[in-house]
Amino acid sequence: MCSLSFFFLFLFSTLFFILGIYYLMIDYSLFIEWELFSLNSSMVVMTFIIDWMSLVFMSFVMYISSLVIYYSNDYMHNEKNINRFIMIVLMFILSMAFLIISPNLISILLGWDGLGLVSYCLVIYYQNVKSYNAGMLTALSNRIGDVAILISISWMLNFGSWNYIYYYYFISDSFEMKIITLLIILAAMTKSAQIPFSSWLPAAMAAPTPVSALVHSSTLVTAGVYLLIRFNPMLMVYDFGWYILFIGCLTMFMSGLGANFEFDLKKIIALSTLSQLGLMMSILSMGYSDLAFFHLLTHALFKALLFMCAGSMIHNLRDSQDIRFMGSIIHFMPLTSICFNVSSLCLCGMPFLAGFYSKDLILEIVCLSWVNFFIFFLYFFSTGLTASYSFRLFYYSMSGDNNYYSSYSFNDSSYFISFGMIGLLIVAVFGGSLLSWLIFPVPYLVVLPWYLKFLTLLTIILGSYFGYVISDFVYSYELFSLNFLSFVMFTGSMWFMPFLSTNYVSYLPLSFGYYSLKSFDSGWGELLGGQGLYSFFVYLINYIQSLYDSNFKVYLLTFVFWMFILFVLFFL
């Protein structure tokens, strides 16, 4: 089933990409209205939008999905129900396709809720307590966004149709559209894990690694960004951009700091995803929706490759995800190491790789835009942090001595895993330049002073050096993380966000429930209710029973008592 799914997904991916580029060249969009049924002149119509953006995005989703499924052929080979796993992944892709081609909030909700439900099934795929808790956190965080979309559907009843794309320029000044835009922003923030909904993304790493490669690169987490790209005209009309800009920059900064003090390989990559999502959100808020979409596509390519390399390393190290157990992997797994380093350099924005064409352009546009120094600082400092944790990953996993069992051997022998990685390596190297030529027929012309032009490269170099400084291990054990323990605890736990969004949110209702149970259900409620009534009736019945059992004694005692009274009355 893996090979069949790979073949069809790859075929559709190629077809959609060619069609998308053709639609882009001739500037063509297609609306398809499918009438499901008609009742007394009321038609139930399903609408699809087929334009270059939806076609190119679907082709990328299907290309990555095809390689992920092929990769799963080896990664999940010990799984008894691998066909079930593939079916769930295909349901995930179908939900994403619904979301991409829908200009209608009802059909968007089908894809949106489908993504949430299937992602829950995939996060809890390994049956243990950790996976279950992570799945619940993922599902409940995303339910907030689902509720926001449901409320926006209710608000759109005032317009007579749920096709939001028709109302951009006609009722853009209405109060209802303002509320709907706010609700869509809330939904996008939950799905794309922006502050304060960020804690579910690292927790979702409990899913199998092929799922992480698909979900956290091109599908689930980018759904919110894609929805905001579609709603971009509304963001510009109501001037909500400043809010998204601030949240996006804070998310980028927080996740960059957190990744520098994390030791779980998959969580580091998840935090890097969070950082790039913040970058997409922030540049989208300035009105550059095409740039955000461009970075979304390039990021999907190299992030899927990064997860695949991480999966290959974890698979060979018998499911160990701690980077402190790794070391000198470059000698044992050269292909994985090459792919891992190329994708890390793409993430940093190293020149002429896929990430460079989008990330460097975004940073140059920021230099050109009217942003204050705080936002400017957050952008470039977060870029430096990206280089820092990328170099730290290389330092811990690739270089140095092997820290795993001395008698343990591992290699790149798996054909399926290697094929999946090479398929993504090619597009991670050449995809950025190809897309920049195709998506921007007239290239962006950014004229800046030389020091601003070189600022990005300088930031990457300084960030790499900082990554070396904080991870360098000397014999005196003077580690940065031990010298600044409080700071490391704060940043390494995502500014205590998992505690705030789980423990503190649930503490009040859970403690209220506990004391209610103790005081009412198990206390006064029992005393005055079931148990109390039971005890009272048992006592009453026992008392009455004792009276019945003592009838003769009572009669005799009463007779003696009355005889005594009569004696007293007559003889005294």
UniProtKB/Swiss-Prot annotation:
The chain crosses the membrane at residues 6-26, 44-64, 86-106, 107-127, 147-167, 179-201, 208-230, 234-254, 268-288, 291-311, 337-357, 372-394, 422-442, 454-474, 479-499, 524-544, 552-572. It is a multi-pass membrane protein. It catalyses: a ubiquinone + NADH + 5 H(+)(in) = a ubiquinol + NAD(+) + 4 H(+)(out). It is found in: Mitochondrion inner membrane. InterPro entries: NADH_DH_su5_C, ND/Mrp_TM, NU5C-like, Proton_antipo_N. One of its GO terms (cellular component) is mitochondrial inner membrane. It holds the Pfam family NADH5_C. It is an enzyme of class 7 (translocase). The keyword ATP-binding does not apply. It comes from the Eukaryota. Its EC number is 7.1.1.2. GO terms for biological process: ATP synthesis coupled electron transport; electron transport coupled proton transport. Keywords: Electron transport, Membrane, Mitochondrion, Mitochondrion inner membrane, NAD, Respiratory chain, Translocase, Transmembrane, Transmembrane helix, Transport, Ubiquinone. GO terms for molecular function: NADH dehydrogenase (ubiquinone) activity. Belongs to the complex I subunit 5 family. Core subunit of the mitochondrial membrane respiratory chain NADH dehydrogenase (Complex I) that is believed to belong to the minimal assembly required for catalysis. Complex I functions in the transfer of electrons from NADH to the respiratory chain. The immediate electron acceptor for the enzyme is believed to be ubiquinone. This is NADH-ubiquinone oxidoreductase chain 5.
